[in-house]
């Protein structure tokens, strides 16, 4: 009798349970999500009523959200706002000014050592330095200005003390250029001078003070004319166009005397032409005629006269060569007809013009 094969009993291990498929979630039906009770009140309404109610609900929600944002904003502390929108460094300077209001001056000590007779002597000097800060309404200066106490010695003479004024200590640019200006340099000092940022012209700058004064006088006297006053009243400075309106020559450039006189004449003539007037006689002449110019021209005329007299009295001896004398004596033996032209003049021979006629030899002397 055949024995039955033993069968292994099935058992479920935790490992097999882990590998088992998860339980599928049962999906809800549409009837479970939307109940009839929730939409019972919509059954008897039209679509226009439902849309109007929806708009009212949306506007109410928007109003609630705005109220919440305003209440949240009011609950936070406001940030300090400056109406002038000042930069950060300006605000920092204002804070520094407030800190140093009570103690606006400070003292610093400087020690100087000097040697006298082999011994080193240390001298301590004190000076007061005041930090000047302007109010917030005006511009704030970053410079440190020394106070009057640091520059004035109590034992010094009163003549060395300079009263503290609000005027600037800087001189005018023309005043720095010409330190020895007199009464004639008033127009020179009032006119603008060259700046450091200007480019160097090709001809260079004019550094002769006398030339600059003379040019300034010429320009000022031309501007005193009625035609220039009319031109400035009709055409303001901001409306003048280069190449279209008369342009005043630049007196600071190192032009030659001839070039400057030509520019002045053209400028004055262009003023009359622009205003539609007839140029006067002063257009072709210079307004200023200095003594130095007169002396220089007089000296030139004297030199020219002296040179002419010397050339007039100069006698140059001409040496005749011997071959020239012999040629002159040879030509003297021939009778040249001077009444005829150079091309037609010939040596006189027989009056018989017929070459075939016999020649008369009776006048020839027999040897």
Swiss-Prot record:
Region named Disordered? 1-24, 49-200, 342-367
The keyword DNA repair belongs to this UniProt entry's keyword annotation: no
Please provide the record's keywords in A-Z order.
mRNA processing, RNA-binding, Ubl conjugation
Query: Posttranslational modification, per the record?
Result: Ubiquitinated by the CBC(fem-1) (Cul2-ElonginB-ElonginC) E3 ubiquitin-protein ligase complex, leading to its degradation.
Report if keyword DNA damage is assigned: no
Compositionally biased region (Low complexity): 183-192
Source taxon at top rank = Eukaryota
The annotated regions of Polar residues compositional bias extend over: 1-12, 147-156, 347-356
Composition bias, kind Basic and acidic residues: at what positions? 57-73
Classification via InterPro entries: SLBP1/SLBP2, SLBP_RNA_bind, SLBP_RNA_bind_sf
Q: Which GO terms describe its cellular component?
A: cytoplasm; histone pre-mRNA 3'end processing complex; nucleus
Task: Give the span(s) annotated as RNA-binding.
Answer: 206-275
Q: Which GO terms describe its biological process?
A: apoptotic process; embryo development ending in birth or egg hatching; mitotic chromosome condensation; mRNA 3'-end processing by stem-loop binding and cleavage; mRNA transport
Which cysteine pairs are covalently linked by disulfides here?
Answer: none
Question: Which GO terms of the molecular function aspect are on file?
Answer: histone pre-mRNA stem-loop binding; mRNA 3'-UTR binding; mRNA binding
The entry's family comment says: Belongs to the SLBP family.
Role, per record: Involved in histone pre-mRNA 3' processing. Required for chromosome condensation, progression of cell death and morphogenesis.
* Annotated protein name in UniProt: Histone RNA hairpin-binding protein
Q: Which organism is it from?
A: Caenorhabditis elegans
Which gene is transcribed and translated to give this protein?
A: cdl-1
């Amino acid at each position: 009798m055949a024995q039955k094969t033993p069968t292994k009993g099935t058992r479920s291990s935790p490992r097999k349970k882990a590998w088992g498929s998860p339980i599928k979630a049962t999906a809800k039906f549409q009837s479970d999500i939307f109940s009839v009770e929730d939409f019972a009140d919509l059954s008897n309404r039209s679509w226009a009523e439902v849309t109007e109610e929806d708009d009212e609900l949306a506007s109410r929600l928007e109003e609630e959200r705005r109220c919440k944002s305003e209440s949240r904003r009011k609950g936070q502390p406001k940030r300090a706002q400056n109406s002038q929108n000042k930069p950060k460094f300006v605000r920092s300077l204002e804070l520094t000014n407030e800190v140093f209001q009570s103690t606006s001056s400070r003292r610093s000590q400087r020690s100087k050592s000097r040697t006298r007779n082999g011994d080193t002597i240390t001298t301590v000097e004190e000076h007061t330095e005041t930090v000047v800060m302007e109010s917030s309404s005006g511009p704030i200066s970053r410079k440190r200005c020394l106070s009057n106490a640091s520059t004035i010695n109590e034992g010094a003479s009163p003549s060395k003390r300079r009263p503290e004024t609000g005027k600037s200590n800087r001189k005018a640019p023309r005043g720095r250029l010409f330190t020895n200006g007199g009464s004639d340099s008033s127009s020179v000092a009032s006119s603008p001078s060259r700046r450091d940022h200007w480019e160097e012209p090709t001809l260079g700058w004019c550094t002769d003070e006398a030339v600059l004064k003379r040019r300034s006088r010429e320009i000022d006297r031309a501007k005193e004319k009625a035609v220039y006053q009319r031109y400035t009243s009709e055409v303001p400075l901001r409306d003048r166009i280069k190449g279209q309106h008369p342009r005043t020559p630049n007196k600071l450039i190192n032009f030659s005397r001839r070039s400057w006189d030509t520019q002045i004449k053209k400028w004055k003539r262009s003023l009359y032409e622009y205003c539609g007037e007839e140029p006067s006689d002063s257009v072709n002449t210079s307004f200023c005629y200095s003594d130095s110019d007169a002396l220089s021209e007089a000296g030139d005329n004297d030199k020219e006269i002296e040179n002419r007299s010397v050339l007039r009295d100069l006698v140059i001896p001409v040496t005749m060569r011997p071959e020239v004398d012999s040629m002159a004596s040879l030509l003297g033996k021939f009778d040249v007809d001077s009444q005829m032209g150079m091309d037609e003049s010939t040596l006189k021979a027989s009056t018989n013009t017929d070459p075939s006629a016999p020649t008369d030899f009776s006048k020839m002397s027999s040897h």
